[in-house]
From Swiss-Prot:
Keywords: Cell inner membrane, Cell membrane, Membrane, NAD, Quinone, Translocase, Transmembrane, Transmembrane helix, Transport, Ubiquinone. The chain crosses the membrane at residues 10-30, 35-55, 67-87. This is NADH-quinone oxidoreductase subunit K. NCBIfam families: PRK05715.1-2. NDH-1 shuttles electrons from NADH, via FMN and iron-sulfur (Fe-S) centers, to quinones in the respiratory chain. The immediate electron acceptor for the enzyme in this species is believed to be ubiquinone. Couples the redox reaction to proton translocation (for every two electrons transferred, four hydrogen ions are translocated across the cytoplasmic membrane), and thus conserves the redox energy in a proton gradient. Belongs to the complex I subunit 4L family. NDH-1 is composed of 14 different subunits. Subunits NuoA, H, J, K, L, M, N constitute the membrane sector of the complex.
């Protein structure tokens, strides 16, 4: 196993992925806007993609890079469906804050 990828130690990539993941989790926990929560979820998914690509390159395997393509496709579909739902709720409730979205009461 190579501990260097393109002249950069592997743990730098993992630390960067951990920082991005932490920022994403903090964004999900703190933000109230549904759009910003979706952006934070995308950060989390991209940090996982970075880990997949890092280990794929370090172990000279293609499996991690193939998984990244599937994760990116699923993330794009999730973002499109999620934003469509947020837009539909925004038209009804006139807000995109998740605290004020209560669909049980119209």
């Amino acid at each position: 196993m190579s501990l260097w990828i393109s002249g950069i130690p592997i743990h730098y990539y993992l630390i960067l992925a951990m920082i991005i993941f932490t920022i994403g989790v903090a964004g999900v926990m703190v933000r109230r806007s549904a759009v910003l929560i979706f952006m934070s979820v995308e950060l989390i998914l991209n940090s996982v993609n970075l880990v997949f690509v890092t280990f794929s390159k370090a172990l000279y395997q293609v499996d991690g890079e193939v998984v990244v393509f599937f994760v990116m496709a699923i993330a794009a579909a999730e973002a499109a469906i999620g934003l469509a739902i947020v837009i539909a709720i925004h038209r009804i409730k006139k807000t995109s804050y998740v605290d004020e979205m209560n669909l049980m009461k119209w």
